[in-house]
Structures are given as C-alpha cells and as structure tokens.
A protein has these predicted regions:
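Metal-dependent nuclease catalytic core centered on acidic motifs
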Residues: 2-16, 23-25, 38, 42-46, ...
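Interdomain/boundary linker segments immediately adjacent to catalytic/signaling cores
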Residues: 21, 26-123
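Short N-terminal edge-element motif at the start of the domain
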Residues: 120-139
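Short, well-structured alpha-helical interface segments that form or flank functional binding sites
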Residues: 124-128, 148, 310
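Conserved catalytic cores of phosphodiester-cleaving nucleases, focusing on short active-site segments
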Residues: 133, 153-155, 161-169, 295-296, ...
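A short acidic/basic microdomain associated with nuclease active sites
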Residues: 135-156
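Beta-sheet entry/capping signal
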Residues: 139, 152, 162-163, 330
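Active-site beta-strand-loop-beta-strand hairpin of nuclease catalytic cores
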Residues: 155-164, 319-327
Length: 333
C-alpha cells in the first residue's frame, strides 16, 4: 500500500532504510559531480541545485548520518528535507508490497532518476498522482507490475474498466529553441571575454544575442561565438555575424532594475528584465558591477518558441500509443 502520511519521528529510520536499499553513493556521487560542474561555471549553481534538489537533500542527510551516526531529531523537523523524506518513504512502501522483479525495477529507476532531473520529475509526478487517489481510498495498480497496459498508473475502481493515468513531466525548456542549461553554459564561455566590459561599468548595458535557430552544437564553435560576442559588447555597438547571428547592444538606466535582488516575485523580475532588454520571456541574466552598473545578457533564437505545440504533440502521440478506447484515460502534467 502506498504510504500517504509520515511523522517526523520516523524520518531518521526511513532515511536509514532508503540508504540501505537504494545506496547512498548514488546521491553522494551525483552531488559531487554537480559541485565539480559548478566550479567550472559560476552561473550553473542555482540552476543545478534546483534541478537536483532531492539529491542535495539526501546528501545533507547522508552527511549528518556520517557525523552523528543517525539523523538528529532536530533535522527531522527541518521542512527543507521533507520532499526527500516523503519520496523515500513512498518508494519504500511500494517496494515492500511489490514482487521482487518490480521492486528491483523501481530501485533501478530511482538510480536513474538521481542522474537525470527529467526522470526524477516524472517519477515524483507519478507518486503525486498515486497519493491523490490513495488518499481517497481508491484501488491502485501499476501496469508495469500487472501487465495491464503501458501507461503509468491504473485506478481500478473508477469507471467500468478502471481509469488509466499517464503522467508527463513538462520542463520549462519544453518547446524552447534555447534551453536554460545551454544559455548558462554559453554565459560561462562568455564570462572571460566580458571582464573588460564590466570593469568600471557604472550604468546599465544590455546585450542581446539572436541566433538564427539554435546555439552551435560544437564546443569550439560556441567558444568562437563567445569571443566574438565579448569583443562586440566591449565595443558598445551591435553587429551582424557571418553565420546570421546578430548582437544588439544598448544602454539603459540601471536604476530601472530597482529591487530585483530582494524581490520574491518572479513575475516582477521577469517583467523588469524584459523591459530593459526589450525581449519577451527569453533566457536572460543580469550581472551587477562594483561600480554600480549592470550588464544584462540575453540569448534568444530568431525562430519562435512552440511550448503549447510541443506539449500537445507529445500528449497526442502518447494518447495514440498508451491509451485505448476501452478504458477512460487521464493525462497529468
């Protein structure tokens, strides 16, 4: 039976069991790899920590266990580790009532989820869906275990043949020509080439790189593009590049950024950045300078993003392959 409630008093023991069954080396190694990547690119820190939040939570629990022999009770009252604790408890509860083959399959899936944020999002969404129906006393089955289909979850007592649930975790990059990680990697390549620009910059300067489709795939080509961008930004005038990319450079009043560093409303931050860069919902970053200025960097594609089309194309394909006319179906994303 899927666990839907967990007391804080049980968190230390739940972690101990989860670490023994899954292996704490999976989150230890993952966090070690992420820290190495962050050391290589200062702009990756927040993004990778957000994308791998559970791995960081589990690693904190591992470190505390190594130091104290078990998780101290005061840490069990820390809300920041509740997502990891609930994930561990639910995975264990499923494995305990599953045939050995399915339990091992789930264990391997958890291993993969620590390596791939998209897989972790998908697995957590399935657990959330299962929790929703379990708390309403519905009878659940996993088609992977029963062979009743290729969808994620079956609610057996809804409708004459049950209700098929298919979960699709949609990331913020869906349908975008420029993904966030790509932009951050490019900013890391650009960083050494904008030092002369930001040194002593006391006003606002916006630089918008527009590529015809996507950023170059080869590292050498991206590095060359970063060098070109750095030189153009330093010159203070926009330019067109032979490959069709363009760079627009313009000054803005730095005071327009206002209280961006202290605001907790993402919508306000996005609106302000869009205003100073004259773009709309693009991958952008603002770097403050010691002289009181700011450099706003934006990477965008000349081709339109197609978020809604990408989502509905995926759902349409999944409906054809995973759902049937004989049983009710539901998508969660």
């Amino acid at each position: 039976m899927l666990l839907t409630e967990l007391s804080t008093a049980r968190i230390p023991e739940v972690y101990r069991q989860f670490a023994a069954v899954v292996g704490d080396g999976h989150w230890k190694n993952r966090v070690g790899q992420l820290k190495q990547k962050i050391r290589g690119n200062r702009f990756l820190g927040q993004h990778l920590q957000n994308e791998n939040a559970l791995a960081y939570q589990f690693e904190r629990l591992r470190e505390l266990t190594a130091k104290f022999g078990r998780i101290p009770q005061w840490e069990a009252n820390n809300h920041a580790i509740y997502p990891a604790a609930s994930f561990a408890a639910q995975v264990l509860s499923i494995m305990e009532v599953s045939p050995r083959q399915f339990a091992e399959q789930l264990r391997r899936r958890v291993h993969g989820a620590f390596k791939n944020p998209d897989d972790m999002r998908g697995l957590r969404l399935e657990l959330s869906a299962a929790t929703h129906f379990a708390r309403r006393a519905r009878r659940l089955a996993w088609p992977e275990m029963t062979g009743e289909g290729t969808f994620d979850l079956l609610v057996k007592d809804v409708g004459p043949h049950g209700l098929a649930i298919e979960c699709k975790a949609i990331s913020e990059d869906k349908g975008r020509k420029i993904h966030k990680r790509e932009a951050l990697d490019f900013y890391g390549l650009l960083w050494p080439h904008i030092q002369s620009t930001i040194k002593g910059l006391s006003t606002g300067l916006s630089a918008v790189l527009t590529v015809p489709g996507r950023l170059p795939t080869k590292h050498a080509d991206r590095l060359a593009l970063a060098r070109q961008c750095g030189a153009i930004i330093f010159g203070g005038r926009g330019a067109s590049l032979p490959d069709g990319a363009t760079i627009r450079v313009a000054e803005f009043d730095g005071s327009r950024l206002g209280d961006i560093p202290s605001t907790t409303r993402p919508g306000e931050v996005r609106a302000t950045i869009d205003e100073v860069t004259k773009t709309s919902n693009r991958q952008a970053m603002v770097i403050g300078t010691h002289a009181g200025g700011a450099l706003a960097l934006t990477v965008q594609s000349g081709s339109d993003d197609i978020f809604m089309k990408a989502v509905f194309d995926r759902l349409s394909d999944s409906a054809k392959r995973q759902l049937s006319e004989d049983r009710g179906g539901m998508f969660l994303f």
